[in-house]
Regions:
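Short, flexible, solvent-exposed loop/turn segments with mixed acidic/basic and small polar residues
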Residues: 72-77, 170-171
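NAD(P)-dependent Rossmann-like dehydrogenase/reductase catalytic/cofactor-binding core
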Residues: 159-175
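Alpha-helix N-cap/loop-to-helix initiation residues
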Residues: 14, 38, 66, 91-92
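Internal alpha-helical scaffold of NAD(P)-dependent oxidoreductase catalytic cores
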Residues: 75-163
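Rossmann-like NAD(P)-binding element
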Residues: 1-30
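Rossmann-like NAD(P)(H) cofactor-binding subdomain of soluble oxidoreductases
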Residues: 19-71
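Glycine-rich, N-terminal phosphate-binding loop of Rossmann-like dinucleotide-binding domains
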Residues: 8-10, 35, 87, 135
Length: 176
């Protein structure tokens, strides 16, 4: 009888997972997510909401690293991190309040954007920089992988995020 569900799966599987939990949760439950893109998942949730009285508030904590897996977990990951919520005019205000309270309780600084503005903003400040880092690393590796032996901190800082999961980032790029 869960009344709050947070989906933390790759972008490509969010719709499928959302449909599954939507069917399983009791009426009036609240669902949120941590996906990097919002337009599609919010539209899917609003379509599902037409059939069952559950609420969805899209969420995106701007936190994390290029590392993945349980061994890389950090208790302080969300402290001071911006968390973007993406309600629409159909989102119940009390649902937004509950999700905001959740994120603030773990140290997040909540801001609210509509799904389209969210996707445009994170494309500019997160997705494009990641693509640039990938392209830079790819270019250097194609020139001569030995060049990495003389790379200094600036290059490593610029390309650190290129070490993130290419599968996850492929999904993000395709969705936004």
């Amino acid at each position: 009888e869960a009344d709050f569900c947070l989906l933390a799966t790759p972008v490509a599987s969010l719709e499928r997972q959302l449909a599954a939990v939507w069917a399983a949760l009791p009426a009036r439950a609240l669902v949120t997510d941590v996906g990097s893109t919002k337009r599609r998942i919010v539209a899917t949730a609003e379509g599902l909401a037409a059939g069952r009285p559950l609420a969805f508030v899209g969420g995106h904590p701007m936190a994390g690293s290029e590392r993945a897996g349980f061994a890389e977990a950090r208790a302080d990951l969300f402290e001071g991190a911006t968390v973007i919520l993406t309600p629409t005019e159909r989102t119940p205000p009390d649902a937004v309040t509950r999700v905001r309270s959740f994120w603030e309780a773990v140290g997040g600084r909540v801001t609210v954007l509509d799904p389209t503005t969210h996707d445009r903003a994170v494309a500019a400040v997160s997705h494009l920089p990641h693509l640039v880092a990938d392209a830079l690393m790819d270019a250097v590796l194609r020139m001569d992988p030995a060049f990495l032996d003389v790379a200094a901190r600036g290059f490593r800082d610029t390309t650190r995020i290129a070490a993130a999961s290419p599968e996850i980032w492929r999904e993000i790029f395709l969705d936004n």
